[in-house]
A protein has these predicted regions:
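Acidic/histidine-rich catalytic neighborhood
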Residues: 447-511
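Alpha-helix capping and helix-loop boundary segments enriched in small/acidic/polar residues
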Residues: 338-342, 355, 404-415, 431-443, ...
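Core alpha/beta catalytic barrel or barrel-like domain that forms the active/cofactor pocket
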Residues: 384-386, 413-426, 462, 467-470
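Aromatic-residue-lined binding/catalytic grooves and analogous aromatic/hydrophobic interfacial grooves
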Residues: 1-408, 424-428, 446-449, 506, ...
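Acidic/His metal-coordination segments adjacent to aromatic residues that form catalytic metal sites
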Residues: 328-339, 393-412, 469-493, 629-641
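Non-catalytic carbohydrate-binding regions of carbohydrate-active enzymes
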Residues: 425-431, 436, 448-458, 521-553, ...
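Short, glycine/acidic-rich hinge or "gate" loops at secondary-structure transitions
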Residues: 320-329, 437-440, 457-467, 517-524, ...
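Well-ordered alpha-helical segments within folded domains of soluble proteins
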Residues: 345-356, 414-425, 496-506, 561-570, ...
Length: 751
């Protein structure tokens, strides 16, 4: 099967281009029919104008009054006061000048190759997901683009006869000062942003023709080697780091990139999804997507969507030192939407939802490095803003890790750090790496628990409440004001925050018991769990999103925060908590009936929720809708108004995995939400908690065969009466338990 996105016309807009990357460097080939344009990015290129900011110590004095107002049901006044003193300018120290904002992620420019004559004859472009090579061909010249994950460079390989202008170009940006650089064998640019970040783009030229610094001729073959460096330590130091990475280029292009392709396959071949093939591969990808939008079917396109998301996870993380932001590592705008920031209330988390199941747990590590890097500032923020030990994350952040609450309303939320505790613990569950649990996951989780030990307050019934609290970015009618916009409603103990506290305390108790540490903390956390405000169900049978029945300001809101316990949390289940599970289904159905899921990432969340609800056809419809309405012609996820935002790509493929294997809690369910349209197929290499690996084949909508390679834990608990060969098998409570040494292959005979 051909694994290529391909087209017979140029990408007229950036969002329809072809993405390449290795985590540190990134590029987008979009051309627009007027020559070659490679949009360049470096993961650390920010202006630093807003890098040095502190939380406002005056905010804390208002916390008792905010709590009094909210506990008395005066949500509007409590929210107004909190917004004034905590969110935006109110939450940032008065000594800091300028508006409250996140530092924007900046493009490194556009590398242009403009042929002297352009006719666009025999135009063809493609992205090969099997080799990572993006190819553009027209007028007898072929351009091949690769982001090398071994040499950590970008390559442009040119074959054919060419005469062209080359250089680095920039959009207008008042924060940027730059100069072109040229010599007899290279070109590029040096720049500095007014915040003090310097950067350099360096392109080395190897050609069998000629090059004079701005004009390139090629007789048969040329190679451009691109590297980018950034820093706040001066242009000389930036250039020196580029110098240190320069190496001779003596191999043929195919030999040069061979180690990269080998490394790529060593990671990507861990998981392979196969679906029934359809005769659509000879049709350009944009035309196939349009047919899909018009109601056609194309399972091969669905597989392409899955493989592309898998490719993006590799391309955005493998050489990275920082996690992927809202646009991953790809941005062409000096002032990108939402500054290409890190959103801690769904978006950054969603970027890593599929990582563990896909066998790419190493992709998670840059996220953990980043989160651990925030801890010093997070401790200061917790103490300064809320008078608490432990850690507090603002709702948005950037690479400077400040934890300052920059957004009025949205940032008066204390759940961000707790959400990431689930990622730490999940990585342990899948890897069974006890050293990771001891040295990284548990210390982080304990900091979160410590914060809530101090933050929770007792009401007059002796119940522990989370105040102030919010359901991220959502609002209710009682907290609306005709005179001013109130973007988010604060409350007492939202369902989202209850779920986060419940989860982190429960998992921290498990972790402490596994490690045999902190015996004195376990009863403290258990006492909190026993006294914590429980999740509630309204008179209409829906899960209460806030602490009482409140009319929603936007019934079809894009966030599904109150359903966290179903996904990604997984502790609300049909078997264990049936009443809450049914209430979540009713809440979810009501939200969608009012137009919910109107962004790409929101649809991705819906796909996972539907899969957890066991509704495969509905989950599949969510993914199809993501392709139809929320994807560009090159399958980039789109957020209204049709701008690239990468989280949906990962939410979508996580949803596909959830249709095939459900592994929340201790039980594993095979094909829990298989859609009718996916009658036949197979998946090889889905990772399981405990370190195991599962492969499945299904025929006519039923499990046909499979195998499980046992992990470090030595056991897998399967939901249902599953017929197995190998290991020690026992049946109890409607489940099948298999135990065997690590590496043992268990054959699945059927259900």
């Amino acid at each position: 099967m051909m694994k290529k996105l391909w087209y017979n016309s140029p990408a007229l807009e950036w969002k329809h281009g072809l993405l390449i990357g290795n985590g540190r460097l990134a590029g987008n080939i979009f051309g627009n029919g007027h020559g070659e344009r490679l949009g360049l990015n470096h993961e650390l290129l920010y202006s630093a104008k807003y890098a040095d900011r502190e939380c406002n110590p005056e905010s804390l004095q208002y916390l008792p009054e905010i709590r009094r107002l909210l506990m008395n049901g005066n949500y509007l006044e409590g929210t107004k006061l909190a917004n004034k003193v905590y969110g935006g300018a109110g939450g940032v120290a008065k000594a800091v000048k300028g508006p409250a904002r996140i530092d924007p992620y900046k493009p490194a420019g556009e590398l242009v190759i403009i042929p002297d004559v352009i006719e666009n004859r025999d135009y063809y472009r493609s992205l090969d997901l099997d080799t990572t090579i993006a190819t553009v061909h027209y007028d007898g010249v072929t351009y091949e683009y690769v982001a090398d994950s071994v040499a950590d460079k970008l390559y442009i390989h040119i074959t054919g006869k060419l005469s062209a202008r080359v250089g680095i170009e920039y959009m207008e940006d008042k924060q940027l000062h730059y100069l072109p650089t040229v010599s007899d064998d290279r070109f590029g640019a040096k720049g500095e942003y007014e915040g003090g970040v310097q950067f350099e783009v360096r392109v080395r030229v190897f050609t069998d023709g000629s090059f004079d610094g701005t004009h390139l001729t090629v007789e048969k073959e040329a190679l451009l080697v691109v590297d980018i460096e950034t820093g706040r330590d001066g242009a000389v130091a930036v250039s020196a780091r580029l110098d240190s990475r320069e190496t001779p280029v003596e191999e043929r292009f195919c030999d040069l990139i061979a180690p990269h392709i080998e490394k790529y396959h060593s990671v990507m071949d861990r998981l392979v999804l196969d679906l029934e093939e359809e005769e659509t591969e000879d049709i350009p990808t944009d035309q196939r997507i349009q047919t899909y939008r018009n109601g056609g079917t194309d399972l091969t396109l669905l597989k392409m969507y899955f493989d592309f998301g898998h490719y993006l996870l590799y391309s955005g993380t493998i050489c990275a030192t920082m996690p992927m932001n809202l646009q991953g590592k790809w941005n062409n705008l000096p002032a990108p939407p939402w500054s290409s920031d890190y959103h801690h209330n769904i978006n950054l988390q969603m970027n890593y939802w599929p990582a563990e199941m896909m066998g790419m747990g190493e992709a998670h590590l840059t996220l953990f490095n980043y989160l651990e890097g925030i801890i010093p500032q997070a401790k200061k923020a917790a103490k300064t803003l809320y008078g608490c030990r432990g850690i507090y994350f603002s709702q948005t952040d950037d690479i400077w890790m400040r934890c300052t609450p920059e957004s009025t309303g949205w940032d008066v939320w204390v759940g961000g750090a707790a959400w990431y505790a689930e990622h730490f613990f999940r990585h342990y569950e899948y890897t069974q790496d006890e050293a990771f649990l001891r040295d990284r996951a548990y210390p982080y989780m304990k900091e979160v628990c410590t914060f809530f030990e101090d933050y929770l307050i007792e009401d007059d019934r002796g119940v522990l409440q989370i105040v102030p609290s919010q359901s991220p970015e959502n609002y209710f009618v009682r907290c609306m004001d005709e005179k001013e916009e109130i973007p988010v409603s604060l409350c007492v103990s939202s369902a989202m925050d209850i779920s986060l506290v419940q989860e982190v305390m429960t998992n921290s108790i498990k972790a402490a018991q596994i490690l045999g540490v902190d015996a004195d903390r376990i009863p403290v956390w258990q006492s909190i769990l026993d006294r914590l405000q429980p999740l509630g169900i309204g008179s209409d049978g829906r899960l209460l999103e806030w602490n009482e029945e409140l009319e929603e300001g936007e019934p079809g809101h894009r966030h599904m925060s109150h359903l966290y316990g179903v996904y990604p949390g997984g502790f609300i289940t049909a078997e264990g908590t049936p009443e809450l599970f049914d209430a979540c289904i009713k809440s979810y159905d009501a939200r969608l009936s009012h137009g919910g899921g109107y962004t790409g990432w929101s649809r991705g969340w819906c796909a996972n929720l539907d899969a957890r609800f066991g509704r495969g056809d509905s989950a599949f419809e969510q993914v199809k809708e993501m392709i139809r309405e929320f994807s560009s012609d090159s399958l980039m996820d789109l957020h209204p108004p049709k701008i690239f935002q990468i989280d949906g790509n990962f939410g979508g493929i996580a949803g596909i995995l959830e249709m095939l294997v459900r592994a929340n809690g201790e039980k594993v369910k095979l094909l829990p939400a298989l859609p009718k349209e996916l009658k036949n197929g197979s998946v090889r290499g889905i990772r399981l908690p405990g370190g195991g690996v599962c492969s499945l084949t299904w025929r006519d909508g039923k499990l046909y065969s499979g195998e499980i390679t046992m992990g470090i834990s030595g056991k897998v608990l399967l939901d249902g009466d599953v017929q197995l060969s190998g290991g020690t098998v026992s049946k109890h409570d409607g489940c099948t338990l298999v135990t065997a040494p690590v590496g043992t292959v268990i054959t699945i005979l059927g259900v």
